[in-house]
Amino acid sequence: MSDNLKIGLQYLTPKHALTRLAGKLASAKMGWLTTAVIKWFIKQYNVNMDEAKNPDPEAYSTFNNFFVRELEDGARPINEDDSVISHPADACVSQFGPIMDGKLVQAKGHVYSAQELLGGDEALAAEFMGGEFATLYLSPSDYHRVHMPCDATLRKMIYVPGDLFSVNPLTAENVPNLFARNERVVCIFDTEFGPMAQILVGATIVGSIETTWAETVTPPTGPAVKTWHYPLSGDDMICFKKGEEMGRFKLGSTVINLFAPNSIKFDDSMENGTPTRMGTPFAHIVK
C-alpha cells in the first residue's frame, strides 16, 4: 500500500468509532483469546517482558492490563542529579528545539501553533514563547506509562477535543497540524525553573488517556475544551517528585513537553530519531 493511500484512508476512516471499539475490546476479559493476542503482540513487536514486574502473558486478564504493565523495581533508574531533567517515557525523539514565533516543528516542512496545541489559551502560550519543546513518540513495543521529568506542582489540566489520526512518523510528515488537531490532555506544572507543559496526545486506537490524579480523562470525548485548576498551596496541592508516574496511554501515542525560555538546555544525547528511556537525562536546568 502506498504512503499516499495510507494517509488518504486515515481521512476517510471513522477514527473515533474505531477507537471506541478498540478500547472496548482491549478492556474485555476474553480468557484464552486475550492471552493469544498478547502473545502475538509480544512476538510481533519484540516486547521485552523480562523487565516487566509480571513477565507471564497469561497473568493479564485484559489486553489493556498488559499494555500498561508495570516494570520491575529498578528497571528504569531515575537520574538523581537535581539539575538534570529526565525523560518522561520510553519513546523515540520525533522533534525538539526552540519554540520560534510561537511555532513548533512537527516534521520537516511542517510547523504548528503552540497556542492551538494548548487549547487556544493565548496567555498560557505566552509563557512558553521563545522556550523549548520536545516531541516523543511511543511505539507499540514501548512501556506506556508516563512519568515526571522533574519535581513539580500541578497547576492546570486541559482536555482538548479533536481528531484521532495516527501519530506515527509517516502521518507526522503528511498531516498538517497533527498534534494540534488530535485529541489531547494538556498538563501544566510549576517547577523551580518555571512553567512546564506535559501533553498527552491521543491517536487512532488509543482507547483512553489517564492521569494519576483524575484517572480516565478520555473517553468519553466531548465537543468543548475543559479546564481544571488545582491549588498551589495548602494540603490539597498535587505535587510530584522526579520519576513519579503521572499518566498512561491505552494504547500508546505521543508526549510533548514545553519549557519556558532560558530555563533548560537539552542533553547532548538528544537527536531526532533516537530512542529514549524513562529516567535518563533529557535536559539540564539553566542556572
From Swiss-Prot:
In terms of superkingdom, the source organism counts as Bacteria
Q: Which residues carry this modification: Pyruvic acid (Ser)?
A: 253
Membrane-spanning intervals of the chain: none
Q: Does the keyword Zinc apply?
A: no
Its principal location? membrane
**Per UniProt, what is one GO molecular function of this protein?**
phosphatidylserine decarboxylase activity
Q: Which cofactor does it need?
A: pyruvate
> What Pfam family is a match, any one?
PS_Dcarbxylase
Q: How is it modified after translation?
A: Is synthesized initially as an inactive proenzyme. Formation of the active enzyme involves a self-maturation process in which the active site pyruvoyl group is generated from an internal serine residue via an autocatalytic post-translational modification. Two non-identical subunits are generated from the proenzyme in this reaction, and the pyruvate is formed at the N-terminus of the alpha chain, which is derived from the carboxyl end of the proenzyme.
The note describing how and how many cofactors are bound reads: Binds 1 pyruvoyl group covalently per subunit.
Q: Does the keyword Nucleotide-binding apply?
A: no
Q: How does it sit in the membrane?
A: Peripheral membrane protein
Which compartment or compartments is the protein found in?
Answer: Cell membrane
Q: Which residues are named in the active-site annotation? A: 90 (charge relay system), 147 (charge relay system), 253 (charge relay system), 253 (schiff-base intermediate with substrate)
**Record's keyword terms, sorted:** Cell membrane, Decarboxylase, Lipid biosynthesis, Lipid metabolism, Lyase, Membrane, Phospholipid biosynthesis, Phospholipid metabolism, Pyruvate, Zymogen
Provide the site residues for: Cleavage (non-hydrolytic).
252-253
What pathway annotation does it carry?
Answer: Phospholipid metabolism; phosphatidylethanolamine biosynthesis; phosphatidylethanolamine from CDP-diacylglycerol: step 2/2
> Can you name a GO cellular component term?
plasma membrane
Question: Per the record, what are the reactions this protein catalyses?
Answer: a 1,2-diacyl-sn-glycero-3-phospho-L-serine + H(+) = a 1,2-diacyl-sn-glycero-3-phosphoethanolamine + CO2
Please, one GO biological process term?
phosphatidylethanolamine biosynthetic process
EC number per UniProt: 4.1.1.65
What this chain does, per the entry, is described as: Catalyzes the formation of phosphatidylethanolamine (PtdEtn) from phosphatidylserine (PtdSer).
> Quaternary arrangement and interactors, per the entry?
Heterodimer of a large membrane-associated beta subunit and a small pyruvoyl-containing alpha subunit.
Q: Which HAMAP family match?
A: PS_decarb_PSD_B_type1 (MF_00662)
The similarity annotation says: Belongs to the phosphatidylserine decarboxylase family. PSD-B subfamily. Prokaryotic type I sub-subfamily.
Q: What is this protein called?
A: Phosphatidylserine decarboxylase proenzyme
